[in-house]
Amino acid sequence: MPTINQLVRQGREVEKIKSKSPAMENSPQRRGVCTRVYTTTPKKPNSALRKVAKVRLTNGSEVISYIGGEGHNLQEHSVVLVRGGRVKDLPGVRYHIVRGSLDLQGVKDRKQARSKYGAKKPKAK
């Protein structure tokens, strides 16, 4: 424990807050190009084939991002919008791809939580 004199001379160092999505560089979203689209398996105890894409962002960094929703139309060289937000059961996936913007279409026949999946309001019959 420091003495009062040591604190007067040096002071306390403020702990820096570490970003959870460093590749975004303090932007809300970033545009990028898909370099690889593939599926991967989650860690225990979950079991599935999660859709992910490796994306090269406009700032040059390459990140792995998650494609939410059922079905997608992404291929290599698709231009996508990436936002922060990790996927708990996929290690290394710290970003999400925004549905319904740029080359990625919204989820088809989505009725609830549509804004999260870029789905238009269905026509009332």
Curated annotation (Swiss-Prot):
Pfam families named among the record's database cross-references: Ribosom_S12_S23
Gene3D superfamilies with a match to the protein in the record: Nucleic acid-binding proteins
PROSITE patterns: RIBOSOMAL_S12 (PS00055)
Keywords, alphabetical: Methylation, Ribonucleoprotein, Ribosomal protein, RNA-binding, rRNA-binding, tRNA-binding
Stretches for region Disordered: 9-31
Gene Ontology terms: biological process: translation
Record PTM 3-methylthioaspartic acid, positions in chain: 89
Keyword RNA-binding listed: yes
GO molecular function annotation: rRNA binding; structural constituent of ribosome; tRNA binding
Cellular component terms (Gene Ontology): small ribosomal subunit
Family membership: Belongs to the universal ribosomal protein uS12 family.
Function: With S4 and S5 plays an important role in translational accuracy.
Oligomeric and partner information: Part of the 30S ribosomal subunit. Contacts proteins S8 and S17. May interact with IF1 in the 30S initiation complex.
Record's protein name: Small ribosomal subunit protein uS12
Biological source species: Verminephrobacter eiseniae (strain EF01-2)
Gene name tied to this protein: rpsL
